[in-house]
Structures are given as structure tokens and as C-alpha cells.
A protein has these predicted regions:
Chain A
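Cofactor-binding active-site loop characterized by glycine-rich and histidine/acidic residues
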Residues: 49-52, 56-183, 199-205, 210, ...
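Short, well-ordered beta-to-alpha junction loops that form the rim of enzyme active sites
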Residues: 92-93, 253-255, 326-328
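A residue-level signal for beta-strand positions that form part of recognition/binding surfaces
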Residues: 14, 85, 248
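Glycine-rich ThDP/TPP pyrophosphate-binding loop and its adjacent helix/strand module
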Residues: 135-323
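Structural signal for conserved beta-strand scaffold positions within catalytic alpha/beta enzyme cores
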Residues: 19, 90, 222-224
Length: 362, 325
């Protein structure tokens, strides 16, 4: 028998709708209503300003280490496609999406300020907490999708992870399960070109990360991750498909981590300034703003007003947070929430500390 | 004597062993190009001095990192791989628990796996329970492994050199808080045998048994106890597996009292094993019940103030000791 080709439909597309100058490719326009466009812009701006403020707070020692999101604000385009009943499964670089989904800025500050309250998910908001072990949350999103199918509800789970996460076995097992069980899971890979100090080129030998979908026979697409319109359009296609029973999709958002990995490092040590400058030209907020101005949806005055408004919102959240933490923490709180009902052995340990503390007071 | 932090001492051990034996290589996430351009970190400068074939930055893949160690060690290389934080060993655990630990046995002793898995552990840097979770008792529950957990820079250096030369898989756990605390380290070549405890303070009233970061806490506690008229002996186990029963039992038979101190959570913690050994073999020497001073049975809290309550300190220790005097 001669060798013969196996017929496979292998295709990976790249989608960009707004170019770097903010010019729209009309044929690809996802026709987002004006008010949603403005909400998306505001959400991106809020995320940028909040990120900047958190960096100041971190430098002042008021909050601990966190992972800045600068440059990755267009992710809100994906979160915007989700319905309230859908689930958002973040890694640790999805603050913009978490805020879009209703998480409060105070709660983010609680997390990085070192309070367990930060992980608390308010009633009615289907976000999972931040996940630290890289890539592990992809598996949760398959489990969530499985439960949605099981119950016959038409929800979708969208999981975010980085380019580095695609090197973990968890990611591949999640993709395989999702494809085999056809779960309504959208895999949203934020390829920001760096995994701490390892560049994308040394993370994976594959030309694209999106093509990893092909091995599992699910659709894979690369989106311009700094173009919120492309992110929205690509995510919508995937979410609609998942919701209508079409199974999972892998999306690669091609973007860039403009800031440090976390506030504990200095990227100048391992990457060139020139690379950063190149990506600054593709800033997702600048580009989107140009587009909105071109359409007269934003004016100088409008931008200024919105920026002022956003800064106020950040300040007010910070004030509420400060007031809350001003009340202090009760060491005994650390025993709560480990179990649904506190086991007697743990209760004894809590009481032991309680005794110790009251003795100290005396 | 030179003063080095544990990070520097580990660095020296790696350097010396790499110079001594070409089969020794290093792999892990950020072991070469690191975000910490900090000379106190264990692998600082090694990439520059030994090149990218011997100091391998890997993709984010703990299972593959540990698997690389298993596979390359059976070929006679001596890999020293790094798992960035202790909780991530769960991802590498198939390779360590089911393979590194068992393949020698399964091969009827034919194959050897001279590998070292280094991992950073310890709470105290406000990074929450998915970064901080001391799992040494898990590792010590795996026959076929050796588990080393040094408490001083000098011990770290001598033990790591032994671990690299050892023909068994060694899990080498470094508490990150120790990376920055200097201590004396001999200038000349030396190794410290794996499986040998060290009496860090000689005393007659109570044996405080500990390891890793808690050894420092034990010594501080012993100081306070001395001021209160209690002469404590501090036994640093240094190796959990194989355990130096002799040093442990000799100390407890002498003092008649035992307090075990570790940072890991209590239930199923390694203190239980120590207490069991003493109950089996030295019960008659005990003048009082033994005590455990440990982290509580909860995940490490995110909050730095709560974390301070979580990590056992010298006051907790002193109170426990005084309670059995
Ligand atoms: C299982 C695991 N291994 C290692 C780490 C340490 N670590 C934290 S972030 C990171 C890189 C992640 O890169 P990527 O997936 O691209 O996400 P990004 O940080 O760029 O958003 C690593 C290795 C971790 N948190 N979890
Ligand atoms: Mg990345």
C-alpha cells in the first residue's frame, strides 16, 4: 500500500478588525451597538487606571505582589459576550474581565492586600477565584461545562490562561476532555508573549498556540488580542457555538504584557525595551479610542470626562477598602471556610488560639 | 569562615558539583534567566558560567521537569531539577511518587535514579495557600525517596552535595525565608551525610525536635527557655527520610521530654511519626506527654497578619515546653 494523505481540515485563522491606527475593516465589523462600544472602552480605561493605582499601592507597601494587566485590557471584549449565568474562570491576569463580570475593585484589593475576603464570590456572580497553579483552571472549566450539559442548561464556561499554561499537561487533558465530551467550554489563551522570563518562542515550538486545537479536532482561532472588536467577534462566535451544542473552541488572543510579570520583578532584566516600544504602538486602548473618535462617539471632552469619572471610581473603591481594613483582622477568622462545618479537631485548634490571645490581652 | 545565606550556599553546592561532574545538570522554570536578578537566589549566575545545555530553562511543565530528571538519570546523568514552589509538586508527583521512588525497586535494583528535586517551600511571603503549603510529610510517605530539609546554610550546602552524589532520588526542600539569612559555611570542601540528625543545642530538660526554618525558631525558643531555667536540647533532623532514629531516641532518653516543632499542618504531619517512634521505643523514658507545635489544620492564609498567626513561633514553642515541665 502506498502512503496516502489523510484528509484533515486544518485551518487556523487570524482575525483583526481594527488596525493599529484605529481603522475598521468594514467587512468584519461585528456591529456592536454604540452604547456597548462605549461601555467596553470605559471598562478598558477603568482597568488601566485601576492597574496603575494598584502598582502605586504595591510600591507603597499597602498591597502585596500582584500581576499587572497593562496591555491586556481588550480581554473585556470576551467577557462581554458572556451572559450572567455563564461562568468566568480566570487565572491571575483577568482583573478587567472580573470587574466586567461584577467583581468589585475592593474585592481585588482585598485579595492583593492579603485578606481572604478577596476570594469571596458575591451571590449571583459566576466567577471562580483567581487560580495560581498555572493552567489548572482549564480543567475546572471542563467540569463546569460538563455540569451545564448534565443539567441541560444552556450556559457556557470561559476559561482564561496564558501562553505558558499551554505547556502544562492540565491544559491538554482539559482540551481533550472538552472535545471528547463536547462541553460548552471556551478556552481563552492570552498569549502575552512572556511566561515570567521565558519568551513565547521558547515556550512552544508550535507556530501558533491556536493550532493546538487541531489535535483535539476543535476549532482554533487566533485573534488580535489588542483589538477589542476582534476579541468580541471571535469570542461571540465561540460562545454561540458552545451554547448551541457545538462544543469547545480554543482562542488565542495575541497580545502583550506591557508591564512586569508581577510586581516582584523587573522585565528590563530579560527583555528589550525595543520590543516593548513596538507593542506600545499597538496599545489596545489608544487604538480603540481612535476608532471611537473617528465615529464621533468620543470627543476630547468626552474622553477627559470619562477618565475623571473612572479615576473617581477607583479612588472611591480604595477608600471603601481602606475603611474596611481599618477595622483590622481577627486572627480567629483564619479558621473559617476551610470546611462546610468546622470539624471538632479544628474547633479545638481555634479555641487554643483564642485562649492564647485572651491570655496575651490580660 | 565565610558567611553565606542558604541561597548562596545552595548556589555554591550546585557550582562545585557541576564543576566536579559533567553529568550534573540543572533544569527548571527560571533557573537560568530569572526575574530575580538577585545574587542570593540559588541558581543565580549559573547559566552564565555553565551555559544553556547544563542550565536549562524549561516551559511551564512540572510533570515534564520531573520526568526529565527520571529519564535522564537512568542514563547516568545527575539532574538537579527545580519545582518553583512546594504546592506545584502535586503536578510533578506522578513522576516523583510513582516513578522516581519505585523504578529502582521494579527493576530489581538494576536501574538507578540519581536525581535531585529541589523545591522552595515555606509560608511567610504573603502569597497564599497555592504558593505556600509544606508537603514534606507527603514526600516522606513514599518509600524509595530520600527527603532532606535543611535549616542552616552550612547544612544545605553539605547535604545538597551529598544528594547530588546519592544514587537514590532525593527531594530537597528549601525554605525560602532562609534564602536571605546569613550563616557560617566552611570554606573547604565538605559533605554532610543524608540521614544524620544534628544536635544544634545540647540541653538536659527537654528535646525540641525540628527541621528547616523551624530550627531557628527552636533555637530562639531555647534561649527564652534558658532564661526561664529550662535547659532545652534542639535536635535538627535535617533528613526526614531516612530518619536518624538513634539521635532522636538518645536525646529523648536523656531529657525525658519531647516537643516536635514544624510549620506544616498538624494532622498527618511528620511530628506524628516522631512521636510514634518515641512512644514505641522510649516511652519509659518520658516524664511527661509529648507535644506538637505546628501550623493549624487550615490552608495558609493570604493575609500577612494572619500568616504570622499561622506560622508557629518561639512563644508557641515556649508555652508548649513549659506546659510539660
Ligand atoms: C503550576 C505552576 N508552576 C509554576 C508557577 C509559577 N508561575 C507563575 S506565573 C508563571 C508563568 C505563567 O505564564 P503564562 O501562562 O504565559 O501567564 P502570564 O503570567 O503571562 O499571564 C509561572 C511559571 C505557577 N504559578 N504554577
Ligand atoms: Mg504569558
Amino acid at each position: 500500500m502506498p502512503r496516502k494523505a489523510i484528509n484533515l481540515t486544518c485551518k487556523v485563522e487570524y482575525l483583526s478588525i481594527l488596525d493599529e491606527t484605529g481603522k475598521l475593516d468594514k467587512k468584519l465589523d461585528p456591529s456592536i451597538p454604540d452604547d456597548l462600544l462605549l461601555r467596553l472602552y470605559r471598562a478598558m480605561l477603568l482597568a488601566r487606571r485601576f492597574d496603575e493605582r494598584m502598582l502605586v499601592l504595591q510600591r507603597q507597601g499597602k498591597i502585596g505582589t500582584f500581576a499587572p494587566i497593562k496591555g491586556q485590557e481588550a480581554q473585556v471584549g470576551a467577557a462581554a459576550v458572556l451572559e450572567p449565568g455563564d461562568w468566568l474562570v480566570p487565572s491571575f491576569r483577568e482583573m478587567p474581565s472580573e470587574l466586567w463580570r461584577g467583581k468589585s475593585m475592593e474585592s481585588v484589593l482585598f485579595t492583593y492586600g492579603g485578606y481572604n475576603e478577596g476570594g469571596y464570590i458575591p451571590e449571583g456572580i459566576n466567577n471562580l477565584p483567581v487560580s495560581i497553579p498555572v493552567g489548572s483552571q482549564t480543567l475546572h472549566a471542563v467540569g463546569l461545562g460538563y455540569a451545564m450539559k448534565y443539567r441541560g442548561d444552556k450556559s457556557v464556561a470561559m476559561v482564561f490562561f496564558g501562553d505558558g499554561a499551554t505547556s502544562e499537561g492540565d491544559f491538554h487533558e482539559a482540551m481533550n476532555f472538552a472535545a471528547v465530551f463536547r462541553t460548552p467550554t471556551v478556552f481563552m489563551c492570552q498569549n502575552n508573549h512572556w511566561a515570567i522570563s521565558v519568551p513565547r518562542s521558547r515556550q512552544s515550538h508550535s507556530k501558533t498556540l491556536a493550532q493546538k486545537a487541531l489535535a483535539y479536532d476543535m476549532p482554533g482561532i487566533q485573534l488580535d488580542g489588542n483589538d477589542v472588536l476582534a476579541v468580541y467577534a471571535g469570542a461571540k462566535e465561540a460562545v454561540d457555538r458552545a451554547r448551541s451544542g457545538g462544543g469547545p473552541t480554543l482562542i488565542e488572543l495575541v497580545t502583550y504584557r506591557m508591564s512586569m510579570h508581577t510586581t516582584a520583578d523587573d522585565p528590563k532584566k530579560y527583555r528589550s525595551e525595543k520590543e516593548v516600544e513596538e507593542w506600545e504602538k499597538r496599545d489596545p486602548i489608544v487604538r480603540f479610542e481612535k476608532y471611537l473618535r473617528g465615529r464621533n462617539l468620543l470627543t476630547d471632552a468626552g474622553v477627559e470626562e470619562m477618565d475623571e469619572d473612572v479615576r473617581n471610581e477607583v479612588r472611591e473603591a480604595e477608600e471603601r477598602w481602606l475603611e474596611q481594613i481599618g477595622k483590622g483582622v481577627d486572627p480567629l477568622d483564619m479558621f473559617d471556610h476551610a470546611y462546610a462545618e468546622m470539624p471538632p479537631s479544628l474547633r479545638a485548634q481555634k479555641e487554643e488560639l483564642e485562649r492564647e490571645l485572651s491570655e496575651k490581652k490580660r | 569562615m565565610q558567611q553565606l545565606t542558604m541561597g548562596q550556599a545552595v548556589n555554591q553546592a550546585l557550582r562545585e558539583e557541576m564543576l566536579r561532574d559533567f553529568n550534573v545538570f540543572i533544569a527548571g522554570e527560571g533557573v537560568g534567566v530569572s526575574i530575580h536578578d538577585n545574587p542570593l537566589m540559588p541558581t543565580a549566575g549559573l547559566l552564565k558560567d555553565f551555559g544553556p545545555e547544563r542550565v536549562k530553562d524549561t516551559p511551564v511543565s512540572e510533570a515534564a521537569i520531573a520526568g526529565l530528571a527520571v529519564g535522564s538519570s537512568v542514563m547516568g546523568l545527575r539532574p538537579v531539577v527545580e519545582i518553583m514552589f512546594n504546592p506545584f509538586v502535586t503536578i510533578a508527583s506522578d513522576m516523583i511518587v510513582n516513578h522516581a521512588a519505585k523504578l529502582r525497586y521494579l527493576s530489581g535494583g538494576k536501574s538507578t535514579f540519581p536525581l535531585v528535586v529541589r523545591m522552595k517551600s515555606g509560608a511567610g511571603f504573603g502569597a497564599g495557600c497555592q504558593h505556600s503549603h509544606n508537603l514534606e510529610a507527603w514526600m516522606a510517605h513514599c518509600p524509595g525517596l530520600k527527603v532532606v530539609m535543611p535549616g542552616t546554610p552550612a547544612d544545605a550546602k553539605g547535604l545538597l552535595k551529598s544528594a547530588i552524589r546519592d544514587d537514590n532520588p532525593v527531594v530537597f526542600i528549601e525554605d525560602m525565608m532562609l534564602y536571605f539569612i546569613p550563616g557560617p559555611v566552611p570554606e573547604e570542601e565538605y559533605t554532610i551525610p543524608i540521614g544524620k540528625a544534628d544536635v544544634k543545642r545540647v540541653g538536659s530538660d527537654v528535646s525540641i525536635v525540628s527541621w528547616s526554618k523551624m530550627v531557628g525558631v527552636a533555637l530562639k525558643g531555647a534561649q527564652i527557655l534558658a532564661e526561664n531555667g529550662v535547659d532545652a536540647e534542639v535536635v535538627d533532623l535535617r533528613t526526614l527520610l531516612p530518619l536518624d532514629r538513634e539521635t532522636l531516641l538518645t536525646s529523648v532518653r536523656k531529657t525525658g521530654r519531647l516537643v516536635v516543632l514544624h510549620e506544616a499542618t498538624r494532622t498527618g504531619g511528620f511530628a506524628g511519626e516522631i512521636c510514634a517512634i518515641v512512644a514505641e521505643d522510649a516511652l519509659n523514658s518520658l516524664k511527661a506527654p509529648f507535644r506538637r507545635v505546628t501550623g493549624p489544620d487550615i490552608p495558609v492564609p493570604f493575609s500577612p497578619p494572619l500568616e504570622r498567626f499561622y506560622i508557629p513561633d518561639e512563644n508557641n514553642l515556649v508555652e508548649a515546653v513549659l506546659g510539660i515541665m
